[in-house]
Structure formats: structure tokens, C-alpha cells
A protein has these predicted regions:
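Helix-turn-helix DNA-binding segment
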Residues: 280-288
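Structured, helix-rich domain cores that form ligand/interaction pockets
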Residues: 1-278, 293-332
């Protein structure tokens, strides 16, 4: 089921062509919303009748407040939820985990009201289940908003050795992870708790490690993922553009750069730790220079163009989960 849906997604990707060393390389780009976290005030209900189980247990008394904390055990009895840590996992009819929901451990400072959050991957929810989950969000949450949105782009059939050379030049932490062959498999930019963390990873290798079946005819498969939290989740369009402005590779440096500039960019790319040995002005100079390189980079420009083509559809998907609440699409 999962493989079938994935294959359908890949065949609907944006077809692109990269020209490098006088060769035209066909590849595909596919943008998606990979994960969503919604936070909102928890609604309270009251019913005019008492709810009693078949065993005679009273799970709700008429006139009392009915909240998320009371609803989840009832769902669990119906095999629609399962306790998981401080929260609950929502299950589909096959028993698959489709979402995680919890009551936040603190009250809203301004109102003193109880808040909750729900976290899910929209790509893993079948169409007929989306309605149920949206109904659940509408039923339980008041004034919902995004606290996290992961925007991802699958880069399909572009050679590993080409894609794994790309870096972000932003002044954030960089953590690379390499495979047994010494090739890059995953790279993180930014702290996990920060408002923006970027990950570039070999999706094909990840799926093989998990022993998951791959779609046919996919030779190479990378994913560029931007994990946006708190206020940055509402500014997702702007953040994606800012990220791509800094996404570059030293493989095709412009001819107008001096030999020293080329050596510096190549060296800083090869050994990220060297950035720490530069003074502020020199860092600023070469970060600015790397962003100029990104403006001329073919893959980066394809990513920007395909994202612009996908923004409206991604916006609709996000907006759809919040029943008409417009998310921030400012591209300035």
C-alpha cells in the first residue's frame, strides 16, 4: 500500500534537466508537507446524559466538562487510540499509528486555559482517513495554529556524488554523518530545538536500512527537509526561500572568482571546522560569496523554480487541515 502510493507520487514529480560537463541529466523534484504539528486550546463539552460502558462503568456523568483527556480513554476502548508516554497515539482501522496527541503540561499564560497538540505525517494518512482526523481536530481544538511544519523536497535520480556535495552556508551548526564507504548519508544544519533545522539525507539508503521496498526504476533518491517550529512554521514559504538562497555546491564555481576565492570556498566546504578559525569579516565575506554561487547553481535554481510552482498546492494542503485558516505565504 505504502509503496504504491509512493510510486504514484514520484511519477507525478516535476521533471527537470541538469546540464553539467556538457551532459544533460534528467531528474525529478517533488515537494511535500512531511510533518505537521497543530496546537490549540482544548474545547470543553457537556452532554445531557451519562455515558456508561457495556460493563456498567461510568465514563462520563451528565453535565460534567468533557475534554480531550476524557475522550482518549474512550477512543482506546474502541481501539481507536493507544496510550503512549504522556499522550496518546491515534490508530487507523488497520491498527497503524496515524497521529500523536497530548494535553500540554502547562496552561496558557494569557488565559489560563488548557492546551493540546496533535502531531502527524499527512503523507501517511490515506484520503479516507483525512476526513476523520480533520473532524477530530475540529472537535477538540479551538483557535488551532501550526507549531511545526516540515517542508520536504525529494530529489530523484540525480547522482549521489552530485547531491552529497551540497551545503548550507548559514551560520548554524553542521553535523554530517557518513556511511561505511565514507560517503555522506545525512547532514543536519541547526540545532534540533531551533526554529529551523535543515536535513539533507539519502532517502534510498534510509529505506534500505529499514528494509522497506523501493519504487521501481529509482536509482538515486535524496531528500532536502526543512523542519520549521513555532513562528517559523507560519513563515514557511519565506523560510524555504531563505534556505535555498544558502544552498550551494563548489562543484561549478563561477569563472569570475579569483583563484584565492575558489581555494577558500573549496577548503571551507571540505573542512567545515575551518570556519571557526576565520574572523567575523572574513566569515561574512565568504558566506556572501557562497550565496552568490548559489544564485548561479543549476540545482538550487531548479529547487527554487519547482518550489514556486508547488507553493499553491502546499498552501492548500496546510490550509485544509485548519478549516480555512490562512497560513502566512509572505515571500518578501
Amino acid at each position: 500500500k505504502d509503496v504504491l502510493n509512493l510510486h504514484e507520487k514520484l511519477t507525478a514529480s516535476s521533471n527537470r534537466r541538469l546540464t553539467t560537463q556538457n551532459f544533460a541529466l534528467p531528474f525529478k523534484l517533488d515537494w511535500s508537507i512531511d510533518r505537521i504539528t497543530i496546537v490549540g486550546f482544548l474545547k470543553k463539552f457537556d452532554f445531557d446524559h451519562t455515558i456508561i460502558t457495556e460493563d456498567g462503568e461510568i465514563v462520563y456523568t451528565a453535565g460534567e466538562d468533557f475534554t480531550l483527556a476524557q475522550a482518549m480513554p474512550i477512543l482506546a476502548r474502541e481501539e481507536g487510540a493507544q496510550k503512549a508516554g504522556a499522550g496518546w497515539v491515534l490508530l487507523d482501522k488497520y491498527g497503524e499509528n496515524i497521529a500523536y496527541v497530548e494535553v500540554l503540561p502547562f496552561l496558557d499564560k494569557a488565559t489560563g486555559r488548557e492546551k493540546g497538540r496533535i502531531d502527524f505525517n499527512p503523507n501517511k494518512i490515506q484520503h479516507f482517513l483525512k476526513i476523520n482526523l480533520k473532524d477530530f481536530i475540529k472537535l477538540m481544538f479551538e483557535d488551532p495554529h501550526f507549531s511545526r511544519a516540515d517542508v520536504a523536497c525529494d530529489i530523484i535520480d540525480l547522482d549521489d556524488e552530485y547531491v552529497n556535495q551540497y551545503r548550507l552556508v548559514d551560520a548554524v551548526s553542521f553535523r554530517p554523518y557518513y556511511g561505511q564507504s565514507g560517503a555522506l548519508e545525512t547532514a543536519y544544519w541547526g540545532a534540533r530545538s531551533s526554529e529551523r533545522q535543515v536535513r539533507l539525507y539519502n532517502k534510498k539508503v534510509e529505506r534500505l536500512k529499514k528494509k522497506e521496498v523501493l519504487p521501481e526504476n529509482v536509482k538515486f533518491w535524496w531528500r532536502l527537509e526543512m523542519q520549521l517550529r513555532r513562528s517559523r512554521a507560519d513563515e514557511w514559504v519565506k523560510v524555504v526561500h531563505e534556505t535555498l538562497d544558502s544552498f550551494y555546491s563548489p562543484q561549478t564555481l563561477p569563472m569570475n572568482l579569483s583563484a584565492t576565492e575558489k581555494i577558500m570556498l573549496t577548503g571551507l566546504h571540505a573542512n567545515h571546522g575551518l570556519w571557526n578559525e576565520l574572523n567575523k569579516d572574513t566569515k561574512r565575506k565568504y558566506r556572501k560569496l557562497a550565496k552568490e554561487v548559489a544564485k548561479e547553481d543549476e540545482l538550487t535554481q531548479h529547487l527554487k523554480a519547482s518550489f514556486s510552482e508547488s507553493v499553491e498546492q502546499l498552501d492548500k494542503e496546510l490550509n485544509n487541515w485548519l478549516y480555512g485558516m490562512t497560513v502566512n505565504r509572505n515571500e518578501d
